[in-house]
C-alpha cells in the first residue's frame, strides 16, 4: 500500500529502480550494434536520455514530477505561439558561428566516442579485472549465476605420481573414457591424439564384481609398483574430513577385486593405507588397527582395546578439525617395517550433545514410541580450559608384530602436549615428531630411533618469549636424505621457521642441528612451504608473497640458500598455485586471478628439457564474464595506527563519484586468515556490488595473515579488540569519502567473521555502523574448542580477563545500532548453537529487541541442510536491502495505522 516516503528512501531508490531503468535503456540501445550503421548507432547513443544526461530523473537530484517538466517545455510564456520574428544580419552571423561550433564539437565528440569504444557491447571487450570504470553495457549478475556455478572456473585435478622405478612426470587420472577408468600417463604424451597405447591402465572399468556384488569406487590409491589398487566404496560421511566405507584390493594384472578383510567384507572401515612396498595394508575399524599382508588372506589385529573413547590410527573430533584437517593418524615408515600411529584417549573429555530434529544421521530407526523425539549425537568436544584428549605416539614392528612406545626425558606432560606432525626420516628408522604445549607457544622437535627405541629433543623454540605469538599447525616438514656425492653430507629436513618477524624456510642438517641454513628471507612470507624438493638438483620449490601479500608466486632456491628464481618467468601481477611432480621436474601452474583462471603444465628450472602444455583456458567463463557487468575492483592499503592493512573495495558498474552509495563491509578477520587477495572470485559480495549497486569493502585487519608476525600476533589473548577496531577505523575512512552515504554502513561475516561482526557492533555502539549480519558466530570463546582457542587466547584459567573482554556482553551497546541479524545452524558441531542462545538470553535480560534471528534445523556449520544455504544468502540480500532502504529505521518508531470507518470507505 502507498505510504509517505522518507528522504533516505528516495536516495536509495536512485541506486535501485532509477539505475535499473537507466541501464535497461543502455542495454536496449547497445543491442542494436549488429543491425544498424555506426553513425546511426552513435546518434542513437547521443540522443539517448540515459547517456546524454537529459533523463527526467537526473542523477544526484530528487525525483522530478514529469508533468512539471512537460509544462516547463510547453509554457505559454516561452513564446511558442507567438508570430515569427525576422532575424537581423548580426544575429544570423552569431547563429552561424554557434552552429559551426556545435557541428565541430559534435564531430570531435563522435571521434572520441568511436575511439573510446563506448558504443560496443561489453561482450566485445576483454575482461579487465583491474579496470577503474565500466564501459559499454551487459547483463546483471544474478544470485542464480553466483550460486549456480556459472562463475566457477574449470580446473583439471592433476595428481602427480612417481613411477615404480622413480620415473618423474607421471599423472594419475580417473574417468578417462576409452583409455580406462584409472590410468597413469606421462605428461609429455597428454593430449597427443590417440595416446591410449602410451598409458598404463590400472583399472579398465569404473566398477568390478566381487562375489556377485557390484563395487563402484569412491576413492582409489595405487600401490607404488602399480600392481595393486586400494579401493574405497560405499562411503558414509562422519565429520568434516572423515567417514567410513568398504575397502577392496584390486589386482591390476587380472582386473579383479577382493575384500580387504575376506572374513568381514561388509565391515565399515574408517581408514586404510597401503605400505610403501605394496605388500600390506594397515586399516582402522571400530577404532582398532589391523594389518593385512597381501600375500595372505589373514588379517592381523594390532590393537584390541579401541572403543568409543579410545582411538587408534585415526584422530578424534578436535584433532581431525584443528590439527590434521584429515582423517589419518597413521604413518608407514619408508621401508615398510614400522607403522607409527596415534593412540587417542578422550575418556576425560566432556560431551556436547548435537540435536537433529528432522533427519537421523546415524541411519538408525528410532525405538518404538520414540519416533517423535530428536536424534541426539554426543560428541567428545574439549572446550577451552576443559580436559583435552590424551594423545600418545606408538609404533608397530611389522616383523615382530609388536606395539611399543619411545620415551623422551624432557617431553611435555600428557595433559600439556599436542602432537602435530610425524615425519619418517627415510630408511634410517628414525622419525621426527613435532610437538607443542597446549597453548601452542613452545615448540619441540623430537628425533626418535625406533630400532634403538630411544629419542631426544633436538630443537626447542619459545615463541611466547620471542614475540608473544603462537605456532601454527603445519604438516609440511620435508626430509632430505644424505647424498655425499651430490653435496649432501648428512640427513636433514626443511621446515618453516621464524626469521626477523616473518615465516620463512630453513634447512636443518644434520637431523639434530637446531641452526638452519636460511633458504628464504625478507619482509614477506612463504606459504605452506616447501612445495617440493628436487633431490637430484638440490633445489627447493616454494610459494611466497614476495611480490605482494595479496599475490602468490612460485620460486626455486638451492639447498645452500643461493640462486633464487621465479618458476613462471615474467608472471606479472597474479595469484598462482603450483603443484610439482614427484621429482620436481614439472609443475602444474594454476593461475587463480585476478583475470580469468587458466592452467598449464611446465618444465621447472631444474629440467633442461623445456616443456609447456595448456590444460585449461576457461574460454566459456571468459565469454560469460564479458557479457556481465562486473564490479569494479579497487585494491589498496590503508594506515591504521601505523599498520598497513590490505583493502578490497568492490564498486558497482558505472560507478559515479557524484552519487552517494551505501557500503557493506564483509570480513572474516580470523587469525592468520586472508580475504583480500587477487583471486578471480565472484561471490555474494560481487553480487551485492554489481546487482544491488552497493559498495562492498573487505579489510584484512590486525590478526590476519601474510603481513608478518607483528601485525598477526598483536591480537593474542584478546580476540576481537583489534579486529573490531580496524573495521571501525576503515569504516570511518569510507564514511568520509564524498561518494559514501555515511548513514548507511553495514558489516557482515560468517563464523569468526560473525563473531567480529558482533564485536564490531558492540565496540562501535552505532556511531559508525548502523547494521550487522552475523552467521554462525562465536559469542564466548569459552564455548569453542580448546586447540584452536587456546592457541590464540591461552587457557581461560590463565587469561580470565581476556576471555571476558572477548565475550559479546555489552548488549546495551548493541542496542544502539539500528538493527542486526543473527543466523545459526542448530546442528552446528563446530560453533555450537549455544553461542547464539546465550547471547539471546543476555539480550532478553536487558530488554534489547533490535535484532532478527533465523535458525536452521539439522544444519551444521556450513548451513546446507534442506536448501538452507540458499536461504542464508536470500535472507542476507533481503535484510540488507531493507536496511539500506531505511525500513529497519522505521521499526524503531512504528505506530499502528489509524483505522478508517468501513462506512466512510464505502462512500
Swiss-Prot record:
Compositional bias (Low complexity): 30-44
Segments on the Cytoplasmic face: 1-93
InterPro entries: AB_hydrolase_fold, Peptidase_S9_cat, Peptidase_S9B_N, Serine_Prot_S9B/DPPIV
Membrane topology: Single-pass type II membrane protein
Compartment(s) of residence: Vacuole membrane
Sugar attachment sites: 560, 805
Keywords associated with the record: Aminopeptidase, Glycoprotein, Hydrolase, Membrane, Protease, Serine protease, Signal-anchor, Transmembrane, Transmembrane helix, Vacuole
Entry GO terms, CC: fungal-type vacuole membrane; plasma membrane
All ranges on the Vacuolar side of the membrane: 115-907
Any one GO molecular function term: serine-type peptidase activity
Keyword Transmembrane: yes
Role description: Type IV dipeptidyl-peptidase which removes N-terminal dipeptides sequentially from polypeptides having unsubstituted N-termini provided that the penultimate residue is proline.
Protein name as annotated: Probable dipeptidyl-aminopeptidase B
